């Protein structure tokens, strides 16, 4: 497909580890315990602070501007490398407004219980922790209003890939 894929969650984790300005902002806001003695991010501590002490918006306000800037840089890199398509995978993409730097937004929807199961398994956390995180996310209905296309992830991974490829082909055909 020639797609450049950027995963915002991975980008945020990398920036929180490597971006010295962001690290300093996090330490100032959340304390030295935000990072382990080896300099690695203390994800457990930050997750507890954010989700149990209602500081999610505070953490997001620090991290998201850095992710947006990194996204713009990634888009430029993808263009230089002649990728046909730039894909940003981001659960929190539409938290505030529709990003002006993206031409088309596709919402991939799945049953909430399936999402909880997938994230719990991926992150090695309890389903209750995932539910608490999801409470900070916008509802599917509000996100649907800001998207151009919706893909239902109600089958296998291969079925999802087929749906995505079909949409990409439709978009390419409409450009011609």
Regions found by a protein language model. Give the residues of each.
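A conserved segment at the C-terminal end of the G1
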Residues: 1-7
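ATP-dependent NMP and nucleoside kinases share a basic, alpha-helical "lid"
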Residues: 72-80, 85-122
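Hydrophobic "anchor" residues on beta-strands that sit immediately upstream
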Residues: 5, 84-85, 144, 148
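ATP-dependent small-molecule kinase phosphotransfer cores
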Residues: 10-84
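An amphipathic alpha-helix signature
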Residues: 1, 23-27, 112-117, 127, ...
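Residue-level signal for inorganic ion chemistry
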Residues: 9, 59, 87, 151, ...
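Small-molecule kinase domains that catalyze NTP-dependent phosphoryl transfer to phosphate-bearing small molecules
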Residues: 71, 100-101, 121, 125-172
